[in-house]
A protein has these predicted regions:
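Conserved donor NDP-sugar-binding/catalytic core segment of glycosyltransferases
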Residues: 110, 114-164, 228
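A recurrent flexible, glycine/aromatic-enriched loop bordering the glycosyltransferase active site
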Residues: 87, 161-192
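Acidic donor-binding segment of Leloir-type glycosyltransferases
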Residues: 35-79
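A short, conserved alpha-helix in the catalytic core of glycosyltransferases
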Residues: 118-119, 185, 189-202, 207-235
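N-proximal low-complexity "stem/linker" segments adjacent to membrane-targeting elements
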Residues: 1-36
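The conserved acidic donor/metal-binding loop of glycosyltransferases
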Residues: 52, 106-110
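Active-site nucleotide-sugar/metal-binding loop of Leloir-type enzymes
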Residues: 35, 68, 91-101
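Lectin-like carbohydrate-binding module/patch detector with strong preference for beta-trefoil
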Residues: 317-453
């Protein structure tokens, strides 16, 4: 990366930093790193937008500090007159900015040396690219910068949460290491976009409230409406990942859930069924008027969500497509179904059993794939195969221990061990096991929907 030479003539950036009651040290660390590590020919301004902070030190003290430290006006302080939330505050920050390119950055970051040139260079090549730096971690306790961003890019879960996924690993010494990596989604706190293009494609959805879902909505919209989203390895920015949520939610509203309904209804077509499978409570939720966003989609002549899945995120697992069967895995004798028991699926854990919810719980939805995996969105069933051993959910792989055979005999057989899935006489909230195959009804299972068996 250090050997790459960039043109002196690149679009100039307005870096937009939104803050609300941010700590003095982390806010100024962010701003100083931007100004100090951005060549002046590329930095038009830093727009520091205060979303109605009520801490005294962020009022006159901050105003005076900015005036004394940057008398040339490179840092501008803009304030909202009421609490807007991160989404509407970013719209306000973008409207206040006058540079060629908008770079949105959270208020608890550190820009690294050489961070801005790769972003501006990529946009200068194609104004329809939205580009993100690689995100390194800053420890939230020690505030130490750790250059561990690696090659992770963005994905999403069907519950419409952002997820990190591994990009194509490239050796650091390879010339290909510096090439941008296409990404289905972005985290949303750190990205660059040409200012006019940002507004051409609809900025943010102003009907979304406070925080949540806006990053996926923008990601889907960019791809579906003719743009591209990339991570740029030679641009690196540190970010403090906090142990608690930095935003307050007026009225304790589930803003992520409500915003995600708006996203699903406008952009996901029939695939919104998977969001509602996870969030049945949102089916009756008032999500406001989305007519303007639907008109925007038509005006921009955007493609379908199926096109997005096929062309941008082809490895995204779809529970009811290209599978043998899917839905509840039910033991008739006990009326128990396999169930995650609401455990964190980013961890490895034993799969449990719970009274069948007849499609009312996403925790009971599994798919039997053509590779004979019994799986969830990212994890597959596996077991050691010993008599009475439990069955775990682990990240899917090609391990033979993850192969299960299910046929019209209604057994589910672990291929590597030849053992059968068995309730073991367990109760609801207990754990399923494998045992030597018999004809016992505790080993008889059916799936809710058979597509090809």
């Amino acid at each position: 990366c250090k050997n790459i030479k960039y043109s002196k003539v690149l679009p100039k950036a307005s870096v937009v930093v939104i803050f609300h009651n941010e700590a003095w040290s982390s806010l100024l660390r962010t701003v100083h790193s931007i100004v100090n590590r951005s060549p002046p020919e590329y930095l038009h301004e830093v727009v520091l937008l205060d979303d109605f902070s009520d801490q005294d030190f962020l009022r006159e003290n901050l105003k005076a500090y900015i005036a004394d430290t940057w008398p040339d006006g490179i840092v501008r302080l803009v304030r909202t007159t009421k609490r807007s939330g991160i989404i509407r505050a970013r719209i306000a920050g973008a409207k206040a900015a006058t540079g060629d390119v908008l770079i949105f950055m959270d208020s608890h970051c550190e820009a690294s040396t050489g961070w801005i040139e790769p972003l501006l260079s990529r946009i200068s090549e194609n104004r329809r690219k939205v580009v993100c730096p690689i995100i390194d971690s800053i420890d939230d306790m020690t505030l130490e910068y750790s250059g561990n961003g690696g090659y992770q890019i963005g994905g999403f879960s069907w519950s419409l949460h952002f997820t990190f996924k591994n990009g194509s690993p490239r050796p650091v010494e390879s010339s290909e290491y510096t090439l941008p990596v296409r990404s289905p989604t972005m985290a949303g706190g750190l990205f660059a976009v040409e200012r006019k293009y940002f507004f051409e494609i609809g900025a943010y959805d102003p009907g979304m409230d406070v925080w949540g879902g806006e990053n996926l909505e923008l990601s889907f919209r960019v791809w579906m409406c003719g743009g591209q989203l990339e991570f740029v390895p030679c641009s690196r920015v540190g970010h403090i990942f906090r142990s608690r949520h930095p935003y307050t939610f007026p009225g304790n509203k589930d803003t992520h859930g409500i915003n995600s309904v708006r996203l699903a209804e406008v952009w996901m077509d029939d695939y919104k069924r998977f969001f509602y499978m996870h969030r049945r409570d949102m089916l009756s939720q008032d999500y406001g008027d989305i007519s303007d966003r639907k008109v925007l989609r038509q005006t921009l002549n955007c493609k379908s969500f199926k096109w997005y899945l096929d062309n941008v995120y082809p490895d995204k697992f779809i529970p009811d497509e290209n599978v043998r069967a899917w839905g509840m895995v039910r033991n008739a004798e006990s009326s128990l179904c396999l169930d995650t028991l609401q455990k964190d699926e980013n961890t490895v854990f034993d799969i449990g059993m719970f009274f069948c919810q007849n499609g009312g719980s996403a925790s009971q939805v599994l798919s039997l794939t053509y590779s004979n995996h019994l799986r969830r969105e990212e994890s597959c069933l596996t077991t050691s195969g010993q008599d009475g051993s439990t069955v775990q959910l682990q990240p899917c792989s090609y391990s033979s221990n993850m192969t299960w055979i299910h046929d019209k005999s209604n057994t589910i057989v672990h291929q590597a061990s030849g053992k059968c899935l068995d309730t073991g006489g367990g109760k609801s909230e207990g754990y399923v096991v494998v045992n030597v195959c018999t004809e016992k009804p505790t080993q008889k299972w059916t799936m809710q929907h058979y597509l090809d068996l």
